[in-house]
Design a protein with these regions (language model features):
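Catalytic and substrate-binding clefts that recognize carbohydrates or anionic sugar/phosphate headgroups
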Residues: 1-119, 127-130
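Short, acidic/polar
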Residues: 133-139
Length: 139
């Protein structure tokens, strides 16, 4: 009874069970918010929650990769996890803890925190993708 989360920016539900994901950085113009894979950022980290324990797996490889989280049906095996990378080594880190927070803290200890810039840097930010779709974009 595992529940999978993570993988960075992905379309669809936050719970990733029963799906196969392609992970590579891609400018997915006009993507479908329910089903498009891949999107702009990928983080090859899954956080798994069970009733009694949480654990995370970080695949330390940023080449294009695929992760199956129970999508493939097999007559001989129950649902399973499968990771495949286009290139590079298979270095991975396993984090365990009672709570999701414990696993997240362990992952952050390895990868580092996101640092926020100074308040003055948080000025106006606009997206040109939105502007080009506007009927008055040329005005």
């Amino acid at each position: 009874d595992e529940r999978f989360y993570g993988l960075g920016e992905k379309a669809g539900d936050l719970q990733r069970n029963g799906k196969r994901y392609e992970m590579r950085n891609l400018d997915a113009m006009g993507y479908n918010a329910a089903s498009t894979v891949p999107l702009y950022k990928h983080i090859p980290f899954t956080l798994t929650r069970r009733d009694d324990v949480s654990y995370g797996l970080f695949y330390d490889n940023l080449s294009s990769c695929w992760l199956d989280l129970g999508n493939e049906i097999d007559n001989y095996h129950t649902a399973y996890r499968r990771w495949q990378a286009e290139a590079g080594d298979i270095d991975y880190y396993l984090f365990t803890g009672k709570r999701v927070l414990d696993v997240t803290k362990a992952f952050v200890r390895l990868t580092g925190k996101t640092l926020f810039g100074p308040k003055w840097s948080l000025g106006y930010s606009g997206s040109t993708m939105h502007y080009t779709d506007a009927p008055d974009a040329q005005d």
